[in-house]
Amino acid sequence: MKSSNPSLTTCIRLNEADFYARFDSPHIVGPQGKPPPLHQVAIERVTICCEITCISDLLRIVDEHPVAENVEYNINMKALHRISEPLRKLDAMIGMESLKEHVVDQIIYFMQDLHVKADATPNTKADAKAENGVFNDYMHTVIYGPPGTGKTEVAQLIGAIFSRMGVLKKTKFKKVTRSDLIAGYLGQTAIKTADVIKECLGGVLFIDEAYALGNADKRDSFSKECIDTLCEALSDHKSNLMVIVAGYEKDLNDCFFNANPGLNSRFTWRYNIDNYTPEQLAKIYEKKVLDCGWTLKDPLRLDWFQNHADYFTCYGRDMETLLARAKIAHSRRIFGSSDDKKRQMTHADLERGLTMFISNDEVKRRKEPGVLTTMYL
């Protein structure tokens, strides 16, 4: 999308003190490696005026406006360039249009330091130990979606973005499930959960299938101990911990958020990953084939994925399993053939791979009427 307001560029002159403070840098040097005389360098002030509606808009700014020591922007261009790599990876993920649109709000909010108290000094902003003396807002995030839709990868990319922006001080990303947080005896669960939280300070704690921590009737004492410990940490470490939870929306609401009334308000940022269409599944399968260095001898048929979509309820995860089975089918078909026949996937390989894929009893049941895809009734 092109901006309705073009970028505005003006040149300014800095006073001598500001000049040498800004340009104590190897990028702009004069004789003997010193900054050039003040009168020789004009500082260009560039104002970026455009509407940001999606990740692509941010990437366009990066592509059109390089970071330079003699250019001053009205936005944090250095931070935007630092996060461009994870932004491109997120933008390149198949589907997820709603998430890609709305995650921009979270990024530009924190990039502008709007989460920081107005009276915070530069030193307290940079101090990872400042804790709640600085931050007004939570980073904690929810990603709704079924298995196999890329929630873990999205969580990793969001964590990388916050780390590169400097909001998080570490690149730490730890994925956990119920067994990593809940112990076998009462009293031990709080300690185990607290230890995991401590390990993740400065980075991201990602709880996959977080609904498994609780239950709808709230009778699990171990779960309550874990969730209460987690809920307290969400506030105590607001400034240096991002917790991301993921799972089915209904299950998370019934079994996780319903377990403690304080949880809901601490997870400000929420995103939905929609179910993949047959066309998107075909694109995911093709990408996985190419990413592993194989080729498609026969073009993929959209109608084939439409006809078998009911088997692929775990979406991207199923495409990975299907490819593994198709590779096995391929190895049998080309046994004894010349090297130029290898790693060229045919439709016959895909068909045989599907036969192997649906031989699993759990996969067979996916086409049966009334089969539930969630863990809880």
Locations of the language-model features?
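The conserved phosphate-sensing helix
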Residues: 97, 310-335
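N-terminal accessory segments that target, anchor, or regulate ATP-driven/P-loop NTPase machines
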Residues: 1-81, 86, 91, 98, ...
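C-terminal engagement/docking regions of AAA+ P-loop ATPases
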Residues: 127, 332-377
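Short glycine-rich substrate-engagement loop in P-loop NTPases that contacts/grips substrate
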Residues: 170-200
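Conserved C-terminal "switch" segment of AAA+ ATPases
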Residues: 165-170, 255-258, 264-265, 270-313, ...
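Canonical AAA+ ATPase core
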Residues: 156, 211-217, 227-282, 291
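Walker A/P-loop
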Residues: 126-171, 195-198
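Pre-Walker A (pre-P-loop) alpha-helix and adjacent loop at the N terminus of AAA/AAA+ ATPase modules
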Residues: 81-141, 160
